Amino acid sequence: TAFAKCRIRGPKAEEFLDYLVANKLPKKIGRINLCHALNTKGGVHSEFTIMKEAENSYYLVSAGANLRLDHDWIQKWMPTDGSVIFEDLTNSTGVLVVAGPKARELMQKVSTDDFSNENFKWLTAKNVNVGYAPVNAMRVNFVGELGWELHHPIEYQNHIFDKLMDCLLYTSDAADDPTC
């Protein structure tokens, strides 16, 4: 869960983020874009993965090492009229990454949801279940392989990890484990 995570919401959330970052914001709910925040000299301040989670609500992910820098910087530029609300989700939201040539096969074992390429395109996010845990699966990762970031309430972290590890052993030609 080594990411900084926050939600920006409110009637002017889109307008605010459009001002704050370079690159286009995702327009459709469930879409993701990689956006860069620029400093006053036009250099890159930080990089954010931004997902539109609802109308007037965006979920932002950045490097965990930049938590204070990024969150303080966002709040510095927020309008003071209450039209934009910042919510730090770093401690309440966990993230596990599943990536590699058998990532889809593993995800199909731990979830009843459809992880096919046709149903789950690059730079999209969907609410799914892993075991009994609610997960926002984001089809994005930066390791050069097929994969998903699994964003979830932190109280489900151990369950999701255990489910992935239990089923990981059964992604080859071995017999399926009935617990997966």
List each model region and its residues.
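Basic, glycine/lysine-rich polyanion-binding surfaces/domains
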Residues: 1-172
